[in-house]
From Swiss-Prot:
Family of this protein: Belongs to the GINS2/PSF2 family.
Role summary: The GINS complex plays an essential role in the initiation of DNA replication.
InterPro entries given in the database record: GINS_A (IPR021151), GINS_bundle-like_dom_sf (IPR036224), GINS_Psf2 (IPR007257), PSF2_N (IPR056784)
GO cellular component, one term: GINS complex
Protein name, entry field: Probable DNA replication complex GINS protein PSF2
Keywords: DNA replication, Nucleus
SUPFAM superfamilies, alphabetized: GINS helical bundle-like (SSF158573), PriA/YqbF domain (SSF160059)
Subcellular location: Nucleus
Annotated disulfide bonds: none
Length: 175
């Protein structure tokens, strides 16, 4: 059974993020665990979905994760460019969460520049995938460090290419 993009997003929203309470927050009883009461100036790690609800209620500010800091994004893009034939290691929910976090965290240096770099990283990684699919021989495709989100986007293309390769191989054997 395949996992849908919506299911990936729901899983990604379970990711823990740091928040800074702006007011006293009572104990949070969530499905996975209970978080103790929080006071202003505390820093806590809670699931993104809860952080977004608290932010919407003006109860906290969400801190930008280090992997989305502008310098980190630039370094990730440089590594992707340098490693032309392999994927660099990025956060597993980098793509589904990047825009949401960039738009909701208070300590973003440059939202537009950061979004542009995230999009560029996505394009570079997609180009690597398409290059790999062109070389697909029907047996294997090595895709180390690809995220679940990326795989879900291109799986039909990969599976279709692999199936065509297998059929051609079977036809060649029959003759």
């Amino acid at each position: 059974m395949a996992i849908s993009p919506e299911e990936i997003l729901h899983i990604a929203y379970e990711e823990l993020v740091e928040i800074e309470p702006m007011t006293s927050i009572p104990e949070l009883r969530l499905l996975e665990r209970t978080y103790p009461p929080l006071m202003p100036l505390d820093i806590a790690r809670i699931p993104l979905y809860a952080a977004l609800l608290l932010k919407k209620s003006n109860m906290c500010k969400i801190r930008l994760p280090s992997y989305l800091q502008l310098e980190s994004l630039k370094m990730s893009m440089d590594v992707e460019i340098e490693k032309a034939d392999e994927y660099s290691c990025i956060h597993p929910y980098f793509f589904p969460l990047a825009t949401e976090l960039l738009e909701n965290c208070y300590n973003v240096e440059s939202i537009e520049e950061s979004k542009m770099i995230v999009e560029k990283i996505k394009e570079i990684r997609l180009a690597k995938t398409l290059k790999g699919i062109k070389c697909l021989d029907g047996k294997a495709l090595n895709m180390n460090n690809i995220t679940l989100f990326e795989f879900n986007e291109i799986k039909e293309l990969i599976l279709g290419s692999a199936e065509v390769g297998r059929r051609i191989e079977d036809l060649a054997k029959d003759q």
